[in-house]
Amino acid sequence: MNKKKRKANLDDGCNPELVRGAKFDGLLEIPVISASSSITIPDGFTPFTRREKALGTDDAICFFEKDPKFADVLIDPAAYIEDFRRFRYLLPMDCSLYIDAPLAVQIINLYRSRAIASYYQRNGCNIYPMARWGNEYTYTTAYFPERIAFLGVTQA
């Protein structure tokens, strides 16, 4: 049986190579996804698992699927750079931000999403930014001095 060995996030310090050269935002130092030089709308959205069947490359690749379907991207983002460059747009990973998850889990999933998107952006992919949030800890300042969900996303 030739199974790919799955690596844990902590095996190498949460993939420090993903944020080499990145800018960071806020107290939590969330990696920044830079604003695009122009605002355009994708022709459509193609789920990651269906990207091989995409008719054109003017679609945005998205990750609005269960996390295990794109786990390989989380494990080895570099393996997908060339594949993702074929498309005009790439949305950040949609790592689940369960509202009943501890705040630390919500923050690490947001961090991973921004770190990988920032990495792809620095490697030639056009990132179509999006803000995501979990429970009220992530989108208000009632519990934390910054709105965590919006860190790392350039706001107009």
Segments predicted by a language model, with ranges:
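Eukaryote-skewed repeat-based solenoidal scaffolds used as protein-protein interaction platforms
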Residues: 49-52, 71-156
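Non-catalytic, usually N-terminal nucleic-acid engagement modules in DNA/RNA processing proteins
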Residues: 10-82, 101
